[in-house]
Structure formats: C-alpha cells, structure tokens
Amino acid sequence: MAKEELIELQGVVDEVLPDSRYRVTLDNGVAVGAYASGRIRKHRIRILAGDRVTLEMSPYDLTKGRINFRHKDERPSSAPANRNFVRR
C-alpha cells in the first residue's frame, strides 16, 4: 500500500503553546494545531506568534499539522546588521 501524499499549506502562527506546539491559521481561514518538525527543533529555529510558516498535513487528519519551514520576515529586523566588527 502506497503512502498517501502530504498536503502542503501556508499559514500564520496565532499562538505558541507548550511542548513546541502552535495554533496556526491557514491561508484559507481554518485554524489547526501544529508542532515543529524535528529539523526545526534540531537547529533551534525559533517560531513566534505572527510568523509565516509552511505546514504539512495528512489527508486523514486535517486538524493537525507539522511545521517544516518558517519564512523569513520581509520587514527589516530591529537589530543592526553586521556593523564591521573589529577585534582589538
């Protein structure tokens, strides 16, 4: 029996829950529960409320998803970018 294809969707993180779980609203308006994938946890990629993410969902359970990518912000960050550090 072949493995079913995963559905890939995009959404915005609404709420950060305990145990690296998140409440995400998809682009179509549906709210789902999601967890961070192992790769995201391994590399300690921080996901905050308001972040745009890509989820994978199983066609059998459309209430849960796995976050496998956090999109970079289009807005500039508040921290200065590489100020030509000089070692003394």
From Swiss-Prot:
InterPro entries: NA-bd_OB-fold, RNA-binding_domain_S1_IF1, TIF_IF1
UniProt gene name: infA2
Keywords: Cytoplasm, Initiation factor, Protein biosynthesis, RNA-binding, rRNA-binding
Function in brief: One of the essential components for the initiation of protein synthesis. Stabilizes the binding of IF-2 and IF-3 on the 30S subunit to which N-formylmethionyl-tRNA(fMet) subsequently binds. Helps modulate mRNA selection, yielding the 30S pre-initiation complex (PIC). Upon addition of the 50S ribosomal subunit IF-1, IF-2 and IF-3 are released leaving the mature 70S translation initiation complex.
Domain S1-like: 1-72
GO MF: ribosome binding; rRNA binding; translation initiation factor activity
PANTHER family documented for this protein: TRANSLATION INITIATION FACTOR IF-1, CHLOROPLASTIC (PTHR33370:SF1)
Pfam families per record: eIF-1a
Gene Ontology CC: cytosol
Signal sequence segment: none
Family that this chain belongs to: Belongs to the IF-1 family.
Compartments where located: Cytoplasm
Keyword Cell inner membrane tagged: no
Protein name (record): Translation initiation factor IF-1 2
Native organism: Bordetella avium (strain 197N)
Subunit structure: Component of the 30S ribosomal translation pre-initiation complex which assembles on the 30S ribosome in the order IF-2 and IF-3, IF-1 and N-formylmethionyl-tRNA(fMet); mRNA recruitment can occur at any time during PIC assembly.
